[in-house]
A protein has these predicted regions:
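N-terminal "arm"/small-domain region of PLP-dependent enzymes with the aminotransferase-like
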Residues: 1-31, 410-414
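Conserved PLP-enzyme active-site core in the AAT-like
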Residues: 10, 16, 35, 46, ...
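Active-site-flanking structural segment that lines cofactor/substrate pockets
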Residues: 20-49
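Non-catalytic terminal extensions of PLP-dependent enzymes
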Residues: 21, 274-278, 285, 299-414
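Short glycine-rich or small-residue beta-strand-to-loop segments that form or flank ligand, phosphate
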Residues: 23, 50-52, 141-144, 298, ...
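Short, flexible, solvent-exposed loop/turn segments with mixed acidic/basic and small polar residues
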Residues: 38, 65-66, 286-290, 320-325
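Conserved glycine-rich beta-strand-loop-beta hairpin in the small C-terminal domain of fold type I
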Residues: 269-270, 288-298, 329-330
Length: 414
């Protein structure tokens, strides 16, 4: 193996190797992979950093498995306290590992944003106290930061609450691998107090799709074998060496020119946002502030009298492909590798759309906080019929959403 023998139409086949002598083995690393991971550990300033070739999804399952192993033995089903905007990888992990989830719901004024669930430290402390009063101590707290719309949690404050309750904080930082390399200092979750954290290197760093990191903070006592076994449990026995080489090559970039290129990208993005603010106030969400990340352009299509999907289609027709669109928002993700020409293309497209869009007072329907609060309360009040594992693995059928009232959702709907 491999069957292509280093030859083929793509041109990269000679680099696509397997666990041959000298190439090391990802889940039993002792040679060049272990050394490369040690280099990444030093670059990110973590206690330990491990590679994944199957994205943050593999890392999420592994870190939840580790957190379950770390909890003291106790009666009852394990429960995780998690913000409701979690990626579906968390739900699949709950099905595989068979734990329950107690949700932290977003504030009512976030009703129109499926991807956002801001959690205040006081709210987290209250939720933990309520669980304790019920005799249910979670094995950890799970947050997504940054989220898809570019909002970040108060990781420092929230980690302090977790640690005061003797719990680990797990952070899905899939969109924030670059946060350690900001010129003003690291805003990476591990430096802010998270215990376990995943980064999708491929989302914001010069790494092939699938390349990711599992980071451990200094408080995590799991030994080397336990961490590698956790990753192996959820990974292919044939990890991609192309992706591993990409992760290794990124170390040199991160140690050399990345911070400067990242700063240039942020400057270009800031200039564009200021232009958009002048054209259509409220179109671009802020890039600065304690609860915003600086490398995600989130557009509120309501400022143009459009839906998010309409704005995304208008951009697509002008040669710009968006990362995400929903009924209200559009998300674009530049990186340190984005060129001046690409920013110019985006600028031209947005100027044209602003010129053609309806008056700014035409907007999508406003969110109804009261209706959202009622919905969240009704969902929480429903008796549980199945565990997540039972629902995901049960026989299923596809039906129209209008006919789903009173039925049990068998898989993530987003």
């Amino acid at each position: 193996m491999p069957g292509h023998k280093g030859r083929g139409p793509l041109g990269c086949e000679e680099l696509d190797i397997t666990e041959i002598a000298g190439a090391d083995e990802l889940y039993e690393a002792e040679g060049i992979i272990a050394q490369s991971e040690a280099n990444a550990t030093q670059l990110f300033g973590t206690a330990r950093t491990y590679y994944s070739t199957e994205g943050s999804s593999q890392c999420i399952r592994a870190m939840l498995h580790l957190a379950l192993q770390m909890q003291p033995a106790k009666a009852g089903r394990p429960v995780l306290l998690a913000a409701r905007n979690a990626h579906k990888a968390l739900l699949y992990a709950a099905a595989l590992l068979d734990f329950d989830i107690q949700w932290l719901w977003p504030a009512p004024d976030a009703a129109g944003a499926l991807c956002t669930c801001h959690v205040e430290p006081e709210a987290l402390a209250s939720a933990l106290d309520e669980l304790a009063a019920e005799g249910r101590t979670p094995f950890g707290v799970y947050l997504t930061s940054p989220d898809y719309l570019g909002f970040v949690q108060d990781i420092a404050g929230l980690s302090a609450v977790c640690h005061a309750h003797g719990l680990p904080l797990l952070v899905d930082n899939a969109h924030g691998a670059y946060l350690h390399f900001l010129k003003e200092g690291s805003r990476h979750p591990i430096q802010l107090g998270a215990d376990l954290c995943c980064d999708s290197a491929h989302k914001t760093l010069p790494v092939l799709t699938g390349g990711a990191y599992l980071h451990l903070g200094p408080s995590v006592q799991a030994d080397e074998a336990a961490v590698r076994n956790a990753l192996a449990l959820f990974g292919s026995t044939s990890p991609s060496y192309l992706i591993l080489q990409s992760l290794d090559a990124a170390n040199a970039v991160l140690a050399d020119s990345f911070r400067e290129k990242l700063d240039i990208c942020r400057w270009r993005l800031g200039m564009l946002c200021r232009e958009l603010d002048a054209l259509r106030p409220g179109l671009a969400l802020p890039l600065t502030g304690a609860h915003r990340e600086p490398l995600k352009l989130t557009l509120d299509a309501a400022a143009l009298g459009l839906s998010g999907q309409q704005l995304a289609q208008a951009l697509r027709e002008r040669g710009v492909e968006c990362e995400y669109a929903d009924p209200r928002y559009v998300v674009l993700m530049p990186s340190a590798e984005s060129s001046a020409a690409e920013f110019a293309c985006l600028q031209t497209a947005l100027h044209a759309i602003c010129d053609e869009a309806p008056a700014a007072d035409v907007s999508v329907a406003a969110d109804d906080p009261a209706a959202f609060a009622a919905l969240a309360g009704a969902l929480e009040a429903q008796p549980r019929r199945f565990t997540i594992r039972e629902a995901v693995l049960a026989p299923q059928e596809m039906i129209p959403a209008a006919e789903a009232v009173g039925r049990i959702c068998a898989a993530p709907a987003v």
